[in-house]
């Protein structure tokens, strides 16, 4: 099936246009051979297939393919027609009425149930889908039909990508190692009082021993990577409003995984008195009552750590000699709502991360990523002595832009670092414990960041998840310092004593 648009609409006029019928006919004939073909390959323009004057308005049907789309065609027709009718007949066009609008698009297999804004029905036919749109002139002007089509094409491509979220290609793998430990590190850390579950789901309280390990990991990253490569520390916000996620692109699909932030409707104590009184009497927090007193979500807690940083650069033009800009943030927690039941420290809702961000020309960004890979390899091989592998990962939304495959590995995409967890067995799933992403021009473009020379800017990011590092390291080495690599043991120093309980 080829992509087709079919729009039945009407120009609403200030008075009956019957007297102008001959002029309208001549204008539509000319338009079919001029403005409705402009910008399209031969034979690929839009076409008015029929029209008539009905109930004092000009009704018409427009059919088109991908190039001059029917909704663009009717808007192209409006202004010249209004000028012609106004000048010759003193008839005005008051607006466009969309009576029926369908898009036929190619798609194989089942897409599943969907509830798309401004789409009243989706029908499956041989070789494709038929979308019935519920739109008016305002939606045409805002290009809502184009956004609907883009969304549907993304969904089809995501499904055609094999039902997988990512494309995965191994790049490098360490030698297989003999592991001195085969237990679950989370259970072992709990058993020895290193960690305890927090009050919230997916949250942990880290005792002195675990905290010492996290600080050691951070120091290794700083000493071996951040300082030698010239990164500067910053503090990024941890409450992220919708505006940031709209510009970063996360607003397209972040909703199942974020913790939402809703402010009070007012800070007036009198407004909240009944909530306080309810708790004082019942010793129960009245969550339903609270829902009625808080505002709409303004955004969420930090999800991906780097987007808020970009507000610092938004709208700025940066001198050439400032590039590459290299910064990092380790100032607070990130939050993601994890599905399923109870997990260990390898999968948490609240986690600790060092976020590394860099910005420059395409060549500078790629070279910066290469140096990061070198330093990570040094850390994982020479200091932590891990068994691990490196894989090229292209999310499907990048794959649809042609960024998959070995030929693109030096450019946009993500490299994951994965480690086996011995307690999961020889065939167990490996843990992704580190990544390096080259994001192309996505963030500089989204936040309108420019170079002094006008050269296109790219960026990259790399998140050091301390829980993931701990999970990989302690799953392979255990908690006994005697089984740790000498270089790591030297950097830890003495493991602090935990807090004793009766």
From Swiss-Prot:
Its EC number is 6.1.1.11. It catalyses: tRNA(Ser) + L-serine + ATP = L-seryl-tRNA(Ser) + AMP + diphosphate + H(+); tRNA(Sec) + L-serine + ATP = L-seryl-tRNA(Sec) + AMP + diphosphate + H(+). It is found in: Cytoplasm. Its cofactor is Zn(2+). Pathway: Aminoacyl-tRNA biosynthesis; selenocysteinyl-tRNA(Sec) biosynthesis; L-seryl-tRNA(Sec) from L-serine and tRNA(Sec): step 1/1. Keywords: Aminoacyl-tRNA synthetase, ATP-binding, Cytoplasm, Ligase, Metal-binding, Nucleotide-binding, Protein biosynthesis, Zinc. Binds 1 Zn(2+) ion per subunit. This ion is coordinated with 2 cysteines, 1 glutamate and a water molecule that dissociates from the zinc ion to allow the coordination of the amino group of the serine substrate, which is essential for catalysis. InterPro entries: aa-tRNA-synth_II/BPL/LPL, Ser-tRNA-ligase_2_arc, SerS_tRNA-bd. ATP binds at residues 336-338, 347-348, 432, 468. Zn(2+) binds at residues 306, 355, 461. GO terms for molecular function: ATP binding; serine-tRNA ligase activity; zinc ion binding. GO terms for cellular component: cytoplasm. Consists of two distinct domains, a catalytic core and a N-terminal extension that is presumably involved in tRNA binding. Catalyzes the attachment of serine to tRNA(Ser). Is also able to aminoacylate tRNA(Sec) with serine, to form the misacylated tRNA L-seryl-tRNA(Sec), which will be further converted into selenocysteinyl-tRNA(Sec). Homodimer. Belongs to the class-II aminoacyl-tRNA synthetase family. Type-2 seryl-tRNA synthetase subfamily. This is Type-2 serine--tRNA ligase. It comes from Methanococcoides burtonii (strain DSM 6242 / NBRC 107633 / OCM 468 / ACE-M). The lineage of its organism: Archaea, Methanobacteriati, Methanobacteriota, Stenosarchaea group, Methanomicrobia. The gene is serS.
